[in-house]
């Protein structure tokens, strides 16, 4: 979480209130370290904490297409699968679970509303309501007010807008999907 997600982290019910958030909000320029391991990568974000200490958040990427986002306090653990569907597109599946308890009705309702890492969809489809064709419903007034850095609501679509704007970058012509 950097400058891009800071405002969202303060209000999203699946993130707000966790003690570690203070480090994310105070140190907006983490130092990233990536370590290649058997089966994927470990992506560490190091932030300054108190008294010459650091706050680390480590996100595993399990090849070829799976992430686990570190939990915040008692919030659910969540992550994504990116599944190729053709040479230029993939389907992103997001999940949440808690290792020691059932998800609360408030957590499930927040996910259904598209909060946390989830998104609302175009009715009857798996296409996000906010998408490249409608500029992710970017709200310049919300951006001016500081409600979001980018004017795009939600963690998932803030990330997707950056990822998708790059276009297809991997030559998949030799794969068999």
Predicted region positions:
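C-terminal catalytic domain of Rieske-type non-heme iron oxygenases
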Residues: 1-177
């Amino acid at each position: 979480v950097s400058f891009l997600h800071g405002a969202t982290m303060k209000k999203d019910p699946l993130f707000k209130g966790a003690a570690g958030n203070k480090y994310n909000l105070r140190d907006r320029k983490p130092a990233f370290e990536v370590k290649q391991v058997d089966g994927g990568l470990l992506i560490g974000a190091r932030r300054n904490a108190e008294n010459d200490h650091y706050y680390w958040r480590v996100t595993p990427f399990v090849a070829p297409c799976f992430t686990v986002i570190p939990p915040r306090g008692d919030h659910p653990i969540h992550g994504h699968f990116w599944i190729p569907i053709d040479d230029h597109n993939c389907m992103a599946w997001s999940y949440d679970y808690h290792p020691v308890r059932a998800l609360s009705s408030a957590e499930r309702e927040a996910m259904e509303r598209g909060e946390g890492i989830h998104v609302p969809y175009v009715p009857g489809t798996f296409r996000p309501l906010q998408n490249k064709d409608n500029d992710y419903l970017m709200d310049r007034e919300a951006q001016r007010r500081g409600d979001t850095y980018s004017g795009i609501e939600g963690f998932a679509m803030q990330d997707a807008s950056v990822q998708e704007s790059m276009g297809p970058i991997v030559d998949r012509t030799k794969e068999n999907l």
